[in-house]
Amino acid sequence: MERLDKILSHLNYGSRKEVKEYIRKGYFMVNGETIYKDDFKVSPLDDEITFDGGVIEYNEFVYIMLNKPKDVISATFDPRYKTVIDLMPEYAKMSVFPVGRLDIDTEGLLIITNDGALAHRLLSPKYHVWKKYYLTFDGIYKEEYQHNFEEGIILDDGYKTLPARFEIIKENEAYIYIHEGKYHQVKRMLEALNMKVTYLKRV
């Protein structure tokens, strides 16, 4: 059993404070009875919660760490390619989606969830969530490039990336850390410095 205000907040009906106010105004019903107490206990999978006459669908949040393979796209549906959701059909009915995207030829860690608030926190640059990639590349890395990564690199469309970190493991192998996710960003960052990514995996 869980508090009604907690469940409704998780379902994005408002902040915890806003939801409490809505309940006190009688906006919600449980099993046909109008509820006015925000701490009213319900079983979200067994009780019927309604708002303005419509039944609220409740899904428990799920969090999946997927090692995305190559040739699979980061989408919920595609008529041509296999998607990450196709790899886990048992979760499709829970309205899960990938948090961000990896290019079709990129492998590695991808979070799958139905928690929109978490997805926003992970994707928004203002939260500074670092993403780490292992890569191999062709070309010559120069020490002065470290300054470029730290200050931001100007891409082919004129966009300047946020500061990143580049860590050489050995010749033509490195880790790169970024906290944004522009289209083909890692590949384009290296191309701006006359290097070419030959393999990319988020770790």
Model-derived features with residue positions:
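Basic, flexible Lys/Arg- and Gly-enriched helix-loop patches that mediate nucleic-acid binding at interfaces
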Residues: 1-203
